[in-house]
């Protein structure tokens, strides 16, 4: 007779040990947790202890025990009832079934609910089959929607029916884990071929990891719209919160989180070596090396390593360009070095550290060019569904879309309605009632979909006494407003108020900078126990007496607002500010904006921040980009108030083939100084823009419904494929450009292919006029349901923007593509032909 299984037998000891360490560090918080654990079964208590042992301090401070109990109880039930789950290696179960956190999302109870919704649909299925089925359920409940950077909880994505890719994948991972399928989120932190990033999901079955697109179901695993894009990535990573690290290449840590390199599953890779030397030319052991890609016109880190005793660091990456920087602190002084490396041609590079303070010596204040190359398209995951599977999947996806659209059609957050609809009985409440819509109005669209009425009530009730002490817009934005940054919206004002006597409150109002002094004394930062992007709420900081530097800055603003002092984090650099004599002043003297940079735009370029330029400040051996908002050039001039220090301006020209022409300008600005710099964007030649991308075969139809292969249409020489959306402005623009250059385009008319949805499109005014002028253009038909998306993704342009225009040179060989309307597209097409 077999011995009964023991829950977490192999890891029980280390779980208990790590839990006790957490409890020892935060005794006040863990005392009530211990009491509640005593009421749980042995297995559930151990599961809870695992969560508490390896969660960030921010989770401990932000959420009550009952939230984590849902995850623990569901995990234990799966282990007891599902033999597949019980047979999992313990580390897989702990990290990828039981654990509550996926990335940096808000945590809310969801697992038990999701299991109840999904469980009956996957009865009798193995993990592979269940993963595919769960993803169809996810598509029925949520789809992509561009939103702000705060990451919703999985249950909020489910309720509102949409989220950005990072939220869709958080939702899908939670859905998979809820029914026992081991799952994790993986990220291309930044693409190399375009300005964006992407997150998707991996599931573990048959002893290995497979991928799928979150809320984007397919009939097979290892297929998604991003399959080709991921082959051009320089890094794809996963993360683990446990201290017992799985096998794999560690590419950095974010506090308590370890990042793992997953690129080999998606792309052709190689190992590169970076050697760092100190100012004496000797190996710099312990230097921090940052590997970065140029994205949104800033160098964004994708991996970080420390050098060994020989001063070397190694990384497995793709075949493209990396910006590599190194930093090191010695005797309180920071040293820095940087270079650009094309890994397609180079295996090694060397960096020589120099003092950060001597980085800009005056002679270096000039524009320096850098050529940034994106990896070539080289897919390693080539599995495709059969025609039968594809047809089945299309039918199921269409049904999922109908279900979801019906669900969200008239959805709104009932908590907002409850908050707005509260009955008013007294004069004081009547005053507060007038600010209810103002409070909701100052929140983001995302906030309004997951805010809680009781939370808003406390903020309104305790802020309203200060409403007459300042201008209304100042009061609403910087006192009443419950949001400071991207923290979870929770109550905190009553908790803060009870910590101070009446006299102390007045002293802090008289000199708000003293609030920071109190925070520095009372709140300890433990970065090794946190994840930098997961914020401890103001109330959580007070409960645990811990918080990251950002969390403490948010606490400063929260205390100030609670006391009726208008305060904020500066939107450019997140420095703390409070209002004094009608203007915001810095809390810390070192963040005072005591210099002015005058940027000149020139005549020909439309400058857009984080699109073709950015500016970053060098501090502690690391450049950090300023978060400029809607600042616009007036009369070709932009005035930027800055702190004194060393800066780097980047300009970048992204080419259609994914490569970039970059320009760098390093400078130092002194207190009181005004400096003028003219922005310069590098221009590209035609040959720099072209690609050679093999497009998949697809079919178009003639007027009588006969199917024609695209390979036949593109067989001889160059062609222009134009998928048109008649009577829509972007399509009208390109048609007008073509008619304005009628003579030039007429010479290529037989090589131009217009694709429309119906014959009626040809009768619309602008399109019919264009066809009359350019008589030999070929006309074909498609319903735009699938081909548009496939070709747009394949050519690395936005498939949701029409017209989609592709220039081919030879059979199904795409050399150029654009989507939507861009000024000068007509001229570009003529140059290409």
Provide a role label for each language-model segment:
Residues 710-734, 751-754:
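Short active-site neighborhood of thiol/selenol oxidoreductases, capturing the structured segment around
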Residues 3-160, 390, 395-544, 554:
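Secondary-structure boundary elements
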Residues 270-281, 595-605:
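A short, amphipathic beta-strand motif
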Residues 799-820:
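A short, hydrophobic beta-strand/beta-hairpin element that forms part of a small beta-sheet core
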Residues 768-802:
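Short, internal strand/loop/helix patches
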Residues 2, 116, 120-136, 145-156, ...:
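Hydrophobic/aromatic-rich core segments of domains that either
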